[in-house]
């Protein structure tokens, strides 16, 4: 396997990791049934691609893709307030199909012929798969740090409360509507960023890149890895992204494998492979503690010295 091909796989896997993390904000943290994340992935991709093909700056195009996806996500967030989980899932599926139809119809998106995008130049460097990979990894690290901080903040605790019981969250004075809209806005904006990276890394996009099957693929990544965690979507994205290479002999049945994995995980391990309540994660944690002893804190040392002096 050549290094160029390896970086091609890694860059795609990294972009889908970013996309899986975006869905996790909406579904894993806020508990909203989003089944059409590919629509917002596509919005970001087409927005960024249209800007750069018309001479715009690459970084500004990425920001624009985030903004457009985030605005549409906020609108969906408002709509979600009037829908129950099942109806929200169906609505987002419908939005995905509608957006694909729109991408096919508009002249500015290239219609059914798709859109060709030149490789961008960033800080004097013509972006290739290696640069896209490292740039996306940096974005993932930044996002993960922000998510860690968010989970420890009032915003993160409010989302956790809403996810567990929206009614109880309201009784504690949490503005459930506002936080749900914020979760949709942030999650879809990150999906738009992933879309902008994807469009320029591929050099060509068409509506099929954002079809409903892509949404199912991303949902599979998050569910298989573990909803509501940071490590889960990352692991799930890396696992699912590697399947095309592992399943080359059964390329026609790839979507069937994704669906089967998703059904099996929901049925037998709904917490995901490495979710917080997963037996696999529990076993790995015990193994880690056995071989890597916990560092003693100052309080532990004081307690030990006090016991030794008795």
Q: Which residue stretches match the model-derived regions?
A:
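Transmembrane alpha-helices and adjacent helix-loop boundaries
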Residues: 1-310
């Amino acid at each position: 396997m050549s290094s160029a091909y390896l970086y091609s796989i890694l860059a795609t896997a990294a972009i889908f990791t970013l996309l899986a993390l975006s869905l996790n904000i909406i579904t894993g943290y806020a508990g909203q049934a989003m089944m059409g994340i590919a629509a917002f992935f596509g919005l970001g991709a087409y927005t960024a691609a249209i800007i750069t093909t018309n001479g715009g700056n690459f970084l500004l195009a990425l920001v624009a893709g985030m903004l457009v996806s985030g605005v549409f996500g906020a609108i969906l967030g408002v709509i979600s307030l009037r829908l129950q989980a099942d109806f929200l899932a169906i609505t987002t599926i419908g939005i995905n199909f509608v957006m694909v139809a729109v991408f096919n119809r508009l002249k500015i998106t290239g219609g059914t012929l798709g859109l060709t995008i030149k490789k961008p130049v960033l800080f004097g460097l013509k972006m290739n798969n290696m640069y896209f990979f490292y740039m996306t990894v940096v974005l993932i690290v930044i996002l993960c740090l922000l998510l860690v901080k968010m989970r420890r903040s009032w915003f993160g605790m409010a989302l956790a409360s809403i996810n567990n019981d929206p009614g109880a969250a309201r009784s504690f004075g949490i503005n459930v509507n506002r936080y749900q809209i914020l979760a949709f806005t942030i999650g879809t904006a990150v999906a738009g960023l992933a879309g902008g990276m994807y469009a320029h890394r591929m050099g060509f996009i068409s509506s099929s890149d954002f079809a409903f099957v892509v949404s199912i693929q991303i949902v599979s990544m998050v569910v298989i890895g573990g909803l509501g965690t940071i490590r889960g979507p990352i692991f799930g994205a890396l696992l699912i992204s590697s399947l095309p290479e592992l399943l080359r002999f059964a390329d026609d049945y790839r979507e069937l494998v994704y669906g089967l994995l998703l059904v099996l995980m929901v049925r037998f391990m709904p917490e995901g492979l490495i979710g917080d309540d997963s037996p696999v994660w529990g076993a790995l944690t015990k193994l880690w503690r056995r071989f890597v002893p916990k560092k003693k804190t100052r309080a532990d040392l004081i307690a030990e010295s006090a016991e030794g002096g008795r």
